[in-house]
Amino acid sequence: MGLTIAQKIIKEHLVSGEMIPGEEIALKIDQTLTQDATGTMAYLEFETMGVPRVKTELSVAYIDHNTLQSGFENADDHRFIQSMAKKYGLYFSRPGNGICHQVHLERFGKPGKTLIGSDSHTPTGGGIGMLAMGAGGLDVAVAMGGGAYYITMPKMYKVNLTGKLQDFVTAKDVSLEILRILSVKGGVGAIIEWGGEGVKTLSVPERATITNMGTELGATTSIFPSDEITRAFLEAQGRGEDYIELKSDDDAAYDRVIDINLSELKPLIACPHSPDNVVTVESLKGTKVDQVCIGSCTNSSLYDMLKAAALLKGKTVAPSVSLSVSPGSKQVLSMLADCGALTDIIASGARLLECACGPCIGMGFSPNSGGVSLRTFNRNFEGRSGTADGQVYLVSPETAVAAALTGEITDPRLLGEMPQVKMPDKFKIDDSAVIPPADAETAKTLEILRGPNIKPFPDSIPQGDTLRAELVLKVGDNITTDHIMPAGAKILPYRSNIPYLSRFCFGVCDETFPERAKAAGQSIIVGGNNYGQGSSREHAALVPLYLGVRAVVAKSFARIHAANLINAGIMPLTFKNPDDYDSLSQSDMLSIKNVYEGMDSGNLVLTDEKTGKDIQLVCSFTDRQKAILKAGGLLKYVGQGGGL
């Protein structure tokens, strides 16, 4: 039987395990990336391991999240990360150089390579045929130290594309269509491979938009073939030597095949507050709009920006709308300036923001109270924009421009003729904002720069054979890592200070949680389906760990968050009968006996001491995961000789 594209890369990088869906496999990692909101903790963890130099082919530290620098905290963290990069062998992308995924696609990504990043949208690299996955910072630290990356061997889904996108219908609409079909949990446990004749009609930036938003499906990653379109992109970036052809075998087998005719798609929009709440744009026509944002790692390429600029040229943003534009990289911004497109954007009345994540993570440009904001981003979770009651819709750049010009949700096909955008044969190459590391000898003499906001990694406790703890919080379905550990301008500066950060844990759900959890000493959280979806931020595990959470019992878990819980020494356990969720109440005292035996058998019994009811739980921990939990987390496991 033939192999899929992903299976070929996995086979080439397989360290241990068998390529059977559901089995644990270990992969050699070629490249890593971090961003500053998760990077500080990842480098503290790496430093603790005592490895003198990163052992990957390439590791890059990006600064793209905490760029406001309204106090000393962000600037200190950036100095810390830069000093770590210089000493330990990483490249450092300076603030203003761009969003990690956009810059990595332009300057570093290579077809056929493995990449993990401490950001959930790392699968952007699948647009050029990388096996690129989001991971927790500790997993990234282990990979930098030469350790393997462990995942459950995924199933293989194929999306077969036919036809060609019509004018004003975009790759973003393809992303929203697959979300409409599969939902935010429909890709869990799978790799989404994109194929068919329609693939040949999509540029690398369009492909990267699609793989970027594959994260919202809960998929392990998404990937496109590496073909002549990939070659042309790499050659235009001056990296033609990085090209290799990658395609699936004709007899490759897939667990599910989905057909999408690109020619039949219409402009789509995701309504508040979930990326899979998808309807047609025309069905919402006339809805008043307060704000429009164009940018993010999903839609900030030169291709997207040129299209937006062409539609804005000679026009003026509606008086009732505030429009922001955030180019994805310094390369994009510079080329917009050179060709005059930047002038067209500014002349329309748009506000030009820094080449960074910005509004996508609530880092400025929050909408007004109850405001309707159309964004070319990938997530519209409640409160993520920085405005608790903000109504955020996800759209393509074309739909965003249509709303900015008319002041209401408008089908972009009503704008008239679509201006033709031609991509350059050569991109403008200037890597001066990427600082290389010191040589190994010089590095030995370098000092790490630490500010007072950087606090140690929280200590974890080895999992004992009996757990007795209060149920301190009960939450529902699709709880995101934004719910667990919010972001935004007020909170992100403290990502390297877990004690202070803990004050905001679950603040969206229950402001009393931090104090109640600390008072309980040790505790259990109960959740519904798809617990921990969204961002890869390990802080959503580290902060509960700091507050004494010992286990999370849910109907189901998102992949990255479940791994982060285990890495922190917290047990993710699943209801055998999901209906048992209803029988538990917040503040009940719960107990689990014979934990080690239950880990081995995959079956545990949780007793509600208030009602006397026994509830069956299940788990599927590998031997390695059991050892991590018994050690008190991955960092302690590595310290005891495991993992590297």
Question: Which functions belong to the PLM regions below?
Answer:
Residues 1-644:
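Fe-S-dependent hydro-lyases/dehydratases of central metabolism
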